[in-house]
Amino acid sequence: DFASLYPNIMLSYNISPETMLCDCCKYYPKVVVPQLGYHICSSHIGLLPEVLRPILFRRFCYKARSKNKKYDKALYKEMQQAWKWVLLVCFGYTGYRNARYGRIECYESITAFSRDILLTAAETVEAAGYSVLHGIIDSLWVKPNKTGCISPVHLSRMISERTGIRMDIEGRYRWIVFL
């Protein structure tokens, strides 16, 4: 599971309504959206990344505390879930047609980067001797093809390094059904 994939994409690629298709980077873009060809400003940080950075940091802190016995696990689990929804709403708002501060190119760019990241992760998985069973939005289910494959922890680190987005192992299953 990629950790807060869409908000991390907005931060990593500076996606914000005022940074999409800017005039200052039109002819020499440093960041181009895969499959779409949109360019993103690299001269200044957008409002969305600026606002999302502290929220995302707070969510990760609360999530870590929700797994630590020294803290009230239930309280921090609820708090990190609340911040998760705030972050998801920020993504959804970028694609809302009547949004005062939205732009469909932001929404399209976030999902394009997400597809690209998922495909890169799948390539990494297969190169490491695993098979991809299923992948959707921000998650991959994989299984080793043979014994002697690298550990799942090492695999998640490789994917994180290659994509620039942290991947966490959410579980291990003896069997699974996809409907």
What residue ranges belong to the model's regions?
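Conserved acidic
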Residues: 2-179
